[in-house]
Amino acid sequence: MSMAVYNNQEGEEGNPFAGALTEFSQWLWSRPLGNPGAEDAEEEAIAAQEELEFPEDEAQARHSCLQRTTSWATPKEVSPSGRVYQTVRHSRMEYSRPTMSIRSQASYFSSSARPLPPPPVPSLMSWTPIAKYHPSSPTSTSSKFLRAAPKLIKRG
């Protein structure tokens, strides 16, 4: 069993799903994984964070990821490998500049009889070109250029 929840948002105001996803993510992350009474339970936790700054645009990008995997022994009837693996991950990316703020977050939960390869975590380097500022102000054209007659270019 695995489940992934994604939420892309530009500002959280007016987004009815923003609060629900945040609550679900907090519940999922705080949820005890594994079999609390198992003596041979193994747990692995990973926390990663990266930041980029774009001084020319006065912009910042941040990515944080928390992942926890727990495994424990189980009868062969339940799992052919003899272990059960549960993984929970929460990933959050933010991009902000003076005129805009974008947030994206994803939560992931899986339970399996064998360790699953980790789902790809979006890299900040691949995400920021999408959000990076590109000047979009309308071009201003002086009226003297509009009145000038077009020049004819002769090619020999």
Curated annotation (Swiss-Prot):
Region (RNA-binding): 57-156
Annotated spans, Homodimerization: 38-54
Subcellular location: Host cell junction, Host plasmodesma; Host chloroplast envelope; Host Golgi apparatus; Host mitochondrion outer membrane
This protein's UniProt keywords: Host cell junction, Host Golgi apparatus, Host membrane, Host mitochondrion, Host mitochondrion outer membrane, Membrane, Phosphoprotein, Transport, Viral movement protein
Cytoplasm in keyword set: no
Post-translational modification: Expressed as a nonphosphorylated 20kDa form and a phosphorylated 22kDa form. Phosphorylated by a host PKC-related kinase. Serine phosphorylation is required for plamodesma targeting.
Region spans: Disordered: 55-81, 133-156
Assigned GO CC terms: host cell Golgi apparatus; host cell mitochondrial outer membrane; host cell plasmodesma; membrane
Protein purpose: Together with movement protein P3a, facilitates long-distance movement of virions in host. Transports viral genome to neighboring plant cells directly through plasmosdesmata, without any budding. The movement protein allows efficient cell to cell propagation, by bypassing the host cell wall barrier. Binds ssRNA.
Entry's free-text remark on domains: The N-terminus is involved in homodimerization. The C-terminus binds ssRNA. The C-terminus is phosphorylated.
Family membership noted in the UniProt record: Belongs to the polerovirus movement protein family.
Known partners and oligomeric status: Homodimer.
More details: Poleroviruses are transmitted by aphids directly into phloem tissue. The virus replicates most efficiently in phloem companion cells and then moves through plasmodesmata between companion cells or into sieve elements for long distance transport.
Protein name: Movement protein P17
The organism of origin for this protein: Potato leafroll virus (strain Potato/Netherlands/Wageningen/1989) (PLrV)
